[in-house]
Amino acid sequence: MPGSLKEETALLLEDYFQHRAGGAALPPSATAAELRRAAAELERRERPFFRSCAPLARAEPREAAALLRKVAAQLETDGGLNWGRLLALVVFAGTLAAALAESACEEGPSRLAAALTAYLAEEQGEWMEEHGGWDGFCRFFGRHGSQPADQNSTLSNAIMAAAGFGIAGLAFLLVVR
C-alpha cells in the first residue's frame, strides 16, 4: 500500500483513468475496485450528462486540466467537498481522460491525473484525512454486510444524495463556460 495520501491518490486515479480508457487490467487493490464500482454506478445513472462532457476535452485537449480545476473550484463554492462530490469529480475527470485517450492526446490523461491528485491530496488533503482518506471513501460507498440488491440501491441513493449538487454545479459551469 502506498505510504501517503498523495501516492495512494495518484495510483488510484492512474488505475481509474486507464480503466476508463479501456484498459482491461484487474484493479490493483480493494480501494481501486470500490472506486471503479462506485464510479460506474454514478456514470450509469448520469450517463447523458457525462457523455456531454467528453467533447469538451476533444475541443481543447491542452485545457482539460484547467477545466478540471475550474470544476473543482465550482464544486467547492457550491457547498464544499463530500464523498459524492469527490466521486462526481473523479468521474468527470475520467470522462475527460477517456476522451483525450481516444483523441490520441498522450499527455492529457497524465495531466488530468496530476491536477486531480494535487487537488485531492494537497488542497483537500486535510478534509480527506479527517474523513478517513480512501478507507473512508470505501466505508461510505462500501458493501459492509448488506445484500447485493440492497447494496446497489443504497449506493445509488447515497451517490445521488451526496453528488446531487455536484452534478448541478458541473452542469452550470459547463453552460456558462
Curated annotation (Swiss-Prot):
Residue span of motif BH1: 75-94
Biological processes, Gene Ontology terms: extrinsic apoptotic signaling pathway in absence of ligand; intrinsic apoptotic signaling pathway in response to DNA damage; regulation of apoptotic process; release of cytochrome c from mitochondria
The keyword Transmembrane helix belongs to this UniProt entry's keyword annotation: yes
Residue window of motif BH2: 126-141
Organism domain of life: Eukaryota
Record's GO cellular component terms: mitochondrial outer membrane; plasma membrane
Gene name for this UniProt entry: NR13
Organism per entry: Coturnix japonica (Japanese quail)
Name used for this protein in its record: Anti-apoptotic protein NR13
Protein task: Shows anti-apoptotic properties. Counteract the pro-apoptotic activity of BAX.
Subunit composition and interactions: Interacts with BAX.
Compartments, as annotated in UniProt: Cell membrane
UniProt KW Metal-binding keyword: no
